[in-house]
Each structure stands twice: as structure tokens, then as C-alpha cells.
Amino acid sequence: MKLVVVGARADGGAHMVLDLIADGAPYEAVAFLDDNRALWGTTVCGVPVLGSPAHVARAVEAGAEGAVVFLGSPRDRERVGGLILAAGLHLPVVVHPRAYVAPSATLGRGTFVGAMATVSTGARVGELVMVAPTALVSHHVEVGDCAQLSPGCRLGGRSRVGRRAFLGLGATVVSARTVGDDAIVGAGAVVIADVEPETTVAGVPARTVQPRT
């Protein structure tokens, strides 16, 4: 499938997607889209940057059939995912060849699973979720749409992560705990109690830093 990649930083997700393709994934990157005007009209790793996500029609003209939305902000992924679908493009599930996804797990459209990540038995992962390299989604976990699981995250069995929640590097959620919608869990935090929606927590054990308003 020919893809447009949303997010064109050569030192970020763009390069990661191109490496995944080079590693044998059945895709071809034909264009990038990015909000950074300085990149428009340039090439990144040999692939042209055609404009912002609002210019998705240009990617369609370039032959794109689907899109990978590689943005770190959950809300941005949600917004851009809507633009992509409105343009008639597919949002394929993209799984690195060296990731493990259990046969009984489910992944929503537009979700990315990076190298050495694990999505275990009975896990249900929503749409446009970013499961970064080395993240662990244990058995019967539920992850809401547009959530971000940074590298090294660990989700214990039967835990839940809400829509648009962001888990920083190496964050851990112990078994059967819930992280609410739009919550932020800081890098290295260990969640041993439920996290309310729109709340930021950090530390070991994780404690509320501030409610988000």
C-alpha cells in the first residue's frame, strides 16, 4: 500500500516509519505531511513533504492510498485522523515485523505497534493508538482511541487506558488499574491506583501533580 506519513521529522517518527518499510513492511511512502512550514517543498529521507495535514488532497494526487499518523500528541492524532478519513484514505494497522501481537488481540485502524513491542492475549487496542517500541500491553488490557504508550511502558493485565491518555517513557500501570481519558502519566511513574480523567500524575508511586482543566 502506498502511504502518506503525517509527521516529517527526520529525527523522529518519519525515520522510524521509513526504517519499518525498509525492514520488510508491505508499504511504500510516497509523501509526508507536516505542520512545519519550513519543511514544505523539501524532501525528508528522499520523500517529498507536500504541505500540512490540511493538504491531504495533494497526497491523494501523489498516489497515496492510506496514511500513518505519526504524531506525539493524542489530540493531534485524533484531529488528523478525521482529515485522513474525510479524504477517503485508509488508516491501516501498522505493526513492525519484530513486534508481537497475540492472535486473540485486536487493534483498531490507524494503530502503530513498534519494534519489540508486545500486545498480549485478549488485549483490545483502539484506533490511532501509538504503541511505541518495547512497550508491553499485557493480557486483557483495554486501550482507548488515540492513546500514546511511549517506549518501555508496561500495562499490567486487565488494566485500562482511556482515550487520548499519554503515558511517558517507562511508565507502569499495575494490573486492573485504570488511567482515565486525557490523563498524563509521567515518565517512569508507577500507577498503583486509578488515575482520574484529565489528571497528570508522576512519581513512584504515582501521585497527582495537577488536575487538567
Predicted regions mapped to residue ranges:
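Residues at the starts of beta-strands that form the adenosine-phosphate
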Residues: K2, E28-V30, G66, H90
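Short hydrophobic segments within beta-strands
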Residues: V5-G7, L33, F70
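Short glycine-rich anion-binding loops that position phosphate/pyrophosphate groups of nucleotides
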Residues: A10-D11, G72-R75, R207
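NAD(P)-binding Rossmann-fold cofactor-contacting core
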Residues: G24-T43
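Phosphate-bearing ligand-interacting subdomains
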Residues: R37-Y100
